């Protein structure tokens, strides 16, 4: 076996037991790693009882996984997979963390975490030493405090144990903030103060297990690769291509804060009521001049250097620190809340990171609440204060209410979809039309109405990961621009921003590492399809509190059918009948039946005929 260690750690927090489990080459060939492998493990262990498994219950599994490209390809990501408390399906979430590299160097391809600890703990991994340790004194801490205490202590412990001279690279750590501890459904798993596995709500899953952090340090070599010379040749090509991404290196994704709204008319403004603006204050140049303290920051081994660090050195929010912010947070902590000033956006982004929340879903719920206040549906009495667009202090107050689950915050902590249902019930008025989500997951900060962005018509509507802008569907279903290719990147476990060499070349690189000899066509018609079909099945099984019906839920948010009210493409909006036709076309091409359910004969062809039992349960629930 090449590029893999061939084993996972299996950690039972309830029994306080740790063991190793083997991974067969056959399973790895079929599911690759990361998102694909995680989906398979969840299906095999929980598939027969999926609807009954509470994502925030002891029975759910939390998977931390690597892929075959981890440690070899430029940049560094780690995959987190579980049953999502947002969608009740499977979301493959990745974060910029060296944890995957450290695990691989310690001899593992990932970790299965099951059960629930009696009290707060953290997981410590140093090569073949694996310990479940008390974390009571760290519970309640945010990232900054954790780095000053827990990580510093463990770093010193390892340095002394190995008798290392100087200051060796610190261990990798992922952790949760108060949002995860209090099981806010859109809590993130954090690392390096400001990087997150946001989509999925896996910070809440980690919190439900009383797991504060996972720390790993490996000193062993990475697994051998199949063809080292070919790997080197391709790496040299890739480095040249990636190093040529000068605009990205210079400005990062934050360059989109102005251009996505002004040039593409697809940026969320005031809960997506608009998508065009011409406010230059949010220009990346203003962030550079007023907030940046570090212009080039990269994940381990990445030549792109797209990350920037903002720090407020003076003013009312002095001490706030954030990564630029990136485009998604500029939009969701900025324009979506009617805020365009860099300092205010940095402040709110800092709060989101310290509290351990997903910036996209947080900005989505804040914008939803603000629109309800704008329309008089939520009142000052409901909130305890006024919630006007552009008022960062009010949004900060609401953030704290959400994390502490106090007052209206208890409802909003359930996420936009569930909060919309509850508020509709309380107020006696349907507010779900103001909830901009797909299957419980907030859409990324890229609209579809203008058709000037990469997101189009059915990008979110039929994605197995709902509103996730990094896993969008497209026609043709088996083309190079849809969720099958994105499932490859998530299963290989690499960053979407280092895929410039292209799908075919990166597949070739994976083959040089693993020796699997996978073709692009094989991925699109077999391996990727197998992963997507299993994700689709688990999403439609859902439960225990929310279930999706593809006949009505394979659709865009109602807001996306409202004509754009301003900008160069004013009046533009998708046609509902056109969307329905494209959804049907997607079903046919991907291998679903006319109702959007994976066909049993396709499952047999993909070698997962066992999943027909789940399909039968879906059909029974939908009376089909």
Curated annotation (Swiss-Prot):
- Cofactor info, note text: Binds 1 [4Fe-4S] cluster per subunit. The [4Fe-4S] cluster has three cysteine ligands and one aspartic acid ligand. Binds 1 tungstopterin cofactor per subunit.
* Annotated residues for binding of [4Fe-4S] cluster: 299, 302, 306, 495
- Main enzyme class: oxidoreductase
Q: Which UniProt keywords apply?
A: 4Fe-4S, Cytoplasm, Iron, Iron-sulfur, Metal-binding, Oxidoreductase, Tungsten
Q: Which family does it belong to?
A: Belongs to the AOR/FOR family.
Q: Which terms does the record give in the GO molecular function aspect? A: 4 iron, 4 sulfur cluster binding; aldehyde ferredoxin oxidoreductase activity; electron transfer activity; metal ion binding
Q: Where is this region: Disordered?
A: 552-575
* Keyword Signal applies: no
Thermal dependence of activity in this record? Optimum temperature is 80 degrees Celsius for the oxidation of hexanal.
For this entry, the protein name equals Aliphatic sulfonate oxidoreductase, WOR-like subunit
What EC number(s) has UniProt assigned to this enzyme?
Answer: 1.97.1.13
The superkingdom listed in its UniProt entry is: Archaea
Q: How does it assemble?
A: Heterodimer composed of a small WOR5-S subunit, with four [4Fe-4S] clusters, and a large WOR5-L subunit, containing the active site tungsto-bispyranopterin cofactor as well as another [4Fe-4S] cluster.
Q: Which SUPFAM superfamilies match?
A: Aldehyde ferredoxin oxidoreductase, C-terminal domains (SSF48310), Aldehyde ferredoxin oxidoreductase, N-terminal domain (SSF56228)
A GO CC term? cytoplasm
Reactions performed catalytically? an aliphatic sulfonate + 4 oxidized [4Fe-4S]-[ferredoxin] + 2 H2O = 4 reduced [4Fe-4S]-[ferredoxin] + a carboxylate + sulfite + 6 H(+); an aliphatic sulfonate + 2 oxidized [4Fe-4S]-[ferredoxin] + H2O = 2 reduced [4Fe-4S]-[ferredoxin] + an aldehyde + sulfite + 3 H(+); 2 oxidized [4Fe-4S]-[ferredoxin] + an aldehyde + H2O = 2 reduced [4Fe-4S]-[ferredoxin] + a carboxylate + 3 H(+); 4 oxidized [4Fe-4S]-[ferredoxin] + taurine + 2 H2O = 4 reduced [4Fe-4S]-[ferredoxin] + sulfite + glycine + 6 H(+)
What Pfam family is a match for this entry?
A: AFOR_C
| Binding site residues for tungstopterin | 77, 93-94, 96, 195-196, 198-199, 353, 357-359, 470, 490, 494-496
The yes or no answer to whether the keyword Chaperone is present is no
What is the stated purpose of this protein? WOR-like catalytic subunit of an oxidoreductase that can desulfonate and oxidize aliphatic sulfonates such as taurine. The activity involves two steps: an oxidative desulfonation reaction, followed by the activation of a second water molecule and oxidation of the resulting aldehyde. May be involved in the oxidation of various aliphatic sulfonates and also phosphonates.
What is the required cofactor set for this protein?
Answer: [4Fe-4S] cluster; tungstopterin
Compartments annotated for it: namely: Cytoplasm
